[in-house]
Amino acid sequence: MSDNADTKKRTRLNKLQKKLRRETGRAIADFNMISEGDKVMVCLSGGKDSYTMLEILRNLQHSAPVNFELVAVNMDQKQPGFPEHILPEYLEKEGVAYHILEKDTYSIVKEKVPEGKTTCGLCSRLRRGSLYGFAEEIGANKIALGHHRDDIVETLFLNMFYGGKMKAMPPKLRSDDSRNVVIRPLAYCREKDIIEFSALKEYPIIPCNLCGSQKNLQRQVIKEMLQQWDKQQPGRIENIFAAVQNIAPSQLADTRLFDFENLEQGQQQGGDQAHRLDVVNLFG
């Protein structure tokens, strides 16, 4: 690579890193994701998103106003051909504390899912359950996942189109069993920025299709639809994500969120600004 090309690469990399760091820091602050003394288990799959998340969190760790610990965890699901040496070599080179959790979920998935069907749903549920339990074992009180803004918007449309729910992917949540707090520090980050950043960093990417599973076709349809929208009208995806944070229950039709029954008695106000959702602190 010529000196000029190398300079351009470093300049672009620094610009992207600053942007991703700024957006991640804002998400952490907005949703109170990390507090003093937290031990954050960073789930590392070997894909672009989790590598980027680990890099940015390590970067923020040096300048954050609170002290917190990071530990990377990868789950070896015993998929044929899984390059088990890649992540340990990378993490040791970077000086990152890590654990490799070995669980043969691959055999379970192959047994339960018919040939040719998408295995991603069951695979992710098994992986999630194992990781949640392991977080307790190592004393981690936060679990960081690498989902980004595009994942959140895609999930919103997946649930609307195929599930009849207006439900996305929250930046912070308590797991169903109430044992774990899950955070998504990349919630404000664009996938295209992560793709470029990952390519410039030349991370040793591990492909996610070693199992031979078909792609999640429903998610792929949504992704392509959103990409087309973004080409036709730049900024549309940003507006959709903003809408997830700007909900007016009185303008929807969920009687659990708004008391339409008592509207005539004046006990409820109408209008766009009426009865915005009260935010409650679920995490103490």
Curated annotation (Swiss-Prot):
One of its GO terms (biological process) is tRNA thio-modification. The keyword Iron applies. Binds 1 [4Fe-4S] cluster per subunit. The cluster is chelated by three Cys residues, the fourth Fe has a free coordination site that may bind a sulfur atom transferred from the persulfide of IscS. It catalyses: cytidine(32) in tRNA + S-sulfanyl-L-cysteinyl-[cysteine desulfurase] + AH2 + ATP = 2-thiocytidine(32) in tRNA + L-cysteinyl-[cysteine desulfurase] + A + AMP + diphosphate + H(+). Keywords: 4Fe-4S, ATP-binding, Cytoplasm, Iron, Iron-sulfur, Magnesium, Metal-binding, Nucleotide-binding, RNA-binding, Transferase, tRNA processing, tRNA-binding. Coiled coil: none annotated. [4Fe-4S] cluster binds at C120, C123, C211. One of its GO terms (molecular function) is sulfurtransferase activity. It is found in: Cytoplasm. PANTHER family: AMINOTRAN_5 DOMAIN-CONTAINING PROTEIN, SULFURTRANSFERASE-RELATED. Homodimer. InterPro entries: Rossmann-like_a/b/a_fold (IPR014729), TilS/TtcA_N (IPR011063), tRNA_Cyd_32_2_STrfase (IPR012089), tRNA_thiolation_TtcA_Ctu1 (IPR035107). Its cofactor is Mg(2+); [4Fe-4S] cluster. One of its GO terms (cellular component) is cytoplasm. Pfam families: ATP_bind_3. Catalyzes the ATP-dependent 2-thiolation of cytidine in position 32 of tRNA, to form 2-thiocytidine (s(2)C32). The sulfur atoms are provided by the cysteine/cysteine desulfurase (IscS) system. This is tRNA-cytidine(32) 2-sulfurtransferase. Its main location: cytoplasm. A motif (PP-loop motif) lies at residues 45-50. It comes from the Bacteria.
